[in-house]
């Protein structure tokens, strides 16, 4: 046989689908790869039989339901897309929610990927030293500061008491940021870095431990020498 890569993939899909049918026949509930392979195989066979795209879109959501699959599989498969060869060419069949609700009640358990958190409010940076200060952007372009940037070393055009900000970052959720437009004055709350206190990189002012007084003095001297406002 001289098979193209697409035809080889089709045989792999068929093998997975046959395994799914065998396990389903034993009464086993299918996992994500098994369910995906079975539905895709049925759609491709329908295309080979000459059925239309519209017909197969509807058919794709009748093959399996939540009674046939493991808990959470339906949530992992909100959309299934498979490219089939039809009498008038190759077309993409898109089936939304291919696994519809069955008759059995769904198990009350976490959904794959669900974030579980306590019922109470989450305390951010609880117990660490904090400081509140006012800073103004004296530059002519916006300055955006990420949650864990060493605030002492931010853009030199930002004017604020830098010594107060040594060893601290913005007290905001990780991955968020605060933006200062040109001329904007705003109040921010800072919190001390956790861990060992070793700070390296950023603007190259610190490169040491925030708990070391000598490191702080040297960082302030570098900031003044490089004309960081507020130093």
UniProtKB/Swiss-Prot annotation:
It catalyses: urea + 2 H2O + H(+) = hydrogencarbonate + 2 NH4(+). Pathway: Nitrogen metabolism; urea degradation; CO(2) and NH(3) from urea (urease route): step 1/1. One of its GO terms (cellular component) is urease complex. Its EC number is 3.5.1.5. It holds the Pfam family Urease_gamma. Heterohexamer of 3 UreC (alpha) and 3 UreAB (gamma/beta) subunits. This is Urease subunit gamma/beta. It comes from Pseudomonas syringae pv. tomato (strain ATCC BAA-871 / DC3000). The lineage of its organism: Bacteria, Pseudomonadati, Pseudomonadota, Gammaproteobacteria, Pseudomonadales.
């Amino acid at each position: 046989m001289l098979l193209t890569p697409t035809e080889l993939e089709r045989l792999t899909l068929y093998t997975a689908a046959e395994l799914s049918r065998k396990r389903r026949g034993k009464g086993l509930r299918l996992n994500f790869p098994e369910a995906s392979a079975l539905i895709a195989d049925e759609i491709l066979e329908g295309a080979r039989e000459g059925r239309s795209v519209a017909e197969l879109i509807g058919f794709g959501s009748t093959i399996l339901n939540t009674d046939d699959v493991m808990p959470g599989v339906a949530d992992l498969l909100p959309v299934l897309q498979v490219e089939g060869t039809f009498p008038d060419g190759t077309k993409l069949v898109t089936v939304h929610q291919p696994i519809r609700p069955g008759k059995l009640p769904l198990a009350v358990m976490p959904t794959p990927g669900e974030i579980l958190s306590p019922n109470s409010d989450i305390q951010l940076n609880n117990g660490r030293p904090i400081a509140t200060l006012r800073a103004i952007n004296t530059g002519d372009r916006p300055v955006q500061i990420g949650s864990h940037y060493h605030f002492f070393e931010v853009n030199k055009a930002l004017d604020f008491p830098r010594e107060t900000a040594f060893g601290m970052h913005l007290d905001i959720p990780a991955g968020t940021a605060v933006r200062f437009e040109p001329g904007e004055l705003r109040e921010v709350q800072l919190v001390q870095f956790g861990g060992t206190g070793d700070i390296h990189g950023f603007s190259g002012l610190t490169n040491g431990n925030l708990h070391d007084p000598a490191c702080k003095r040297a960082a302030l001297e570098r900031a003044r020498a490089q004309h960081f406002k507020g130093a």
